[in-house]
From Swiss-Prot:
A double ring-shaped homohexamer of HslV is capped on each side by a ring-shaped HslU homohexamer. The assembly of the HslU/HslV complex is dependent on binding of ATP. Belongs to the ClpX chaperone family. HslU subfamily. Keywords: ATP-binding, Chaperone, Cytoplasm, Nucleotide-binding, Stress response. The keyword DNA repair does not apply. It is found in: Cytoplasm. Its main location: cytoplasm. InterPro entries: AAA+_ATPase, ATP-dep_Clp_protease_ClpX, ATPase_AAA_core, Clp_ATPase_C, HslU, P-loop_NTPase. It comes from Paracidovorax citrulli (strain AAC00-1) (Acidovorax citrulli). ATP binds at residues 18, 60-65, 251, 316, 388. ATPase subunit of a proteasome-like degradation complex; this subunit has chaperone activity. The binding of ATP and its subsequent hydrolysis by HslU are essential for unfolding of protein substrates subsequently hydrolyzed by HslV. HslU recognizes the N-terminal part of its protein substrates and unfolds these before they are guided to HslV for hydrolysis. Gene3D superfamilies: 1.10.8.60, DNA helicase RuvA subunit, C-terminal domain, P-loop containing nucleotide triphosphate hydrolases. This is ATP-dependent protease ATPase subunit HslU. GO terms for molecular function: ATP binding; ATP hydrolysis activity; peptidase activity; proteasome-activating activity. The keyword ATP-binding applies.
Length: 438
């Protein structure tokens, strides 16, 4: 669980996302409250439920990017899902309970990786011993002491990488092919249980394999680490981590909102909302690792709400998202900042890509300003897709350089206002062309 302060979280988000201070503050406070709750007396802790968040804003302004970055900062089980993938039970689509099952899988993976990291040094020592037993067979027969001079010499060579290319034959667990069982829609849990049941049938088989020592060492280290990790303890802690610290981000929630004026039958849109409701307000979901309570899982939802309004969601679901954050559309200045100030901006990405072929890409401020203006104008005249427009415009701008990069090796390409206008101005001014090309 991350112990970063709200200011630190916002500062980290600022490195990747321009503007949207309201949304950043909301998720930062929500994440910090997860940590605060863990410090509270256990009797009161159970009564403190998370304040779920609804983010509203047009496409391409940073809603999904905030979720992606939050996942890396949270240091807690985190899953992002699309609301459109789920349908009411009885229709074609995924069962909403699979959200919790997937969250638990993430928690188990995180917990196991953390435990493997702790025992890594012991596992590496055990793997080295197994390789040395193959290299110096006499050590196994008792003719020489286990820590003989020869063994120490070989251990030193092994650690220095001098033996990496030597081939040896070792016994390793035979990884049998995974039995794939295709369950019907909404029956993913049953299919998972059947897979687990079949995988446990029969004894573990071992097989002799001839491998380079470098590969054998990695394989044996993973095998030894698996023996040192207590799987039952991993499952118990992972379930608790998912229940107490889990975060679920549901994107495109507006797509399951039913518009009041819409006629005809909406394919179970309200049904999806009603199925999500118990999950958000607190229920118990059965997973292959055990029962999971969702009372303290934090839910963050987002949607553009172009056609529907937040008030079109069923009232019970609206009430479960007390924190509403509206994200603003991006301005020309925001586009410029995205191109120049973010940690891994498109400008830096293209410069790094073309540098691999010896081409130096130099962006001057006037060129970036003109590029931002063109992206903004195209968004205004056609569909507003926010910052995603910059990717389309940049790809078109550097199409020629990217194609001829091998011929331009050793040269510097200067991207100024004239360069941008020469390649994009005619396209951006022609609405038909910009609609289909930019």
């Amino acid at each position: 669980m991350s112990s970063m302060t709200p200011q630190e979280i916002v500062s980290e988000l600022d490195r990747h996302i321009v503007g949207q201070s309201g949304a950043k503050r909301a998720v930062a406070i929500a994440l910090r409250n997860r940590w605060r709750r863990q410090q509270v007396d256990p009797a009161l802790r159970q009564e403190i439920t998370p304040k779920n968040i609804l983010m509203i804003g047009p496409t391409g302004v940073g809603k999904t990017e905030i979720a992606r970055r939050l996942a890396r900062l949270a240091d807690a089980p985190f899953i992002k899902v699309e609301a459109t993938k789920f349908t009411e039970v009885g229709y074609v689509g995924k069962d909403v309970d699979s959200i919790v099952r997937d969250l638990v899988e993430v928690a188990v993976k995180q917990t196991r990786e953390a435990d493997v990291k702790k025992v890594r040094a012991r596992a590496e020592d055990a793997a080295e011993d197994r390789i040395l037993d193959v290299l110096i067979p006499t050590a196994r027969t008792g003719e020489q002491p286990a820590d003989s001079t020869a063994r120490q010499v070989f251990r030193k060579k092994l650690r220095e990488g001098q033996l990496d290319d030597k081939e040896i034959e070792i016994d390793v667990a035979d990884a049998r092919p995974q039995l794939e069982i295709m369950g019907p829609q909404g029956m993913e849990e049953m299919a998972e249980q059947l897979r687990g049941m079949f995988s446990q049938m029969g004894h573990e088989r071992r097989k002799a394999r001839k491998l380079r020592i470098a590969e054998a060492l990695k394989l044996l280290t993973d095998e030894e680490a698996g023996k040192l990790v207590n799987e039952e303890e991993v499952k118990t802690r992972a379930l608790q981590n998912a229940e107490q610290n889990g975060i679920v981000f549901i994107d495109e929630i507006d797509k399951v909102a039913t518009r009041q004026e819409a006629g005809g039958s909406d394919v179970s849109r309200q049904g999806v909302q009603r199925d999500l409701l118990p999950l958000v307000e607190g229920t118990t979901v059965s997973t292959k690792y055990g029962m999971v309570k969702t009372d303290h899982i934090l839910f963050i939802t987002s949607g553009a709400f172009h056609l529907a309004k937040p008030s079109d969601l069923i009232p019970e679901l609206q009430g479960r998202f007390p924190i509403r954050v509206e994200l603003e559309s991006l301005s020309v200045g925001d586009f410029e900042a995205i191109l120049t100030q973010t940690h891994a901006s498109l400008v830096k990405q293209y410069q790094a890509l073309l540098a691999t072929e010896g081409v130096t890409l130099e962006f001057v401020p006037e060129g970036i300003t003109r590029l931002a203006h063109i992206a903004f104008e195209v968004n205004e005249r056609t569909e507003n897709i926010g910052a995603r427009r910059l990717s389309t415009v940049m790809e078109r701008l550097l199409d020629e350089v990217s194609f001829d990069a091998a011929k331009l090796s050793g040269q510097t390409v200067r991207v100024d206002a004239a360069y941008v206008d020469g390649r994009l101005a005619s396209l951006s001014q022609n609405e038909d062309l910009s609609r289909y090309i930019l």
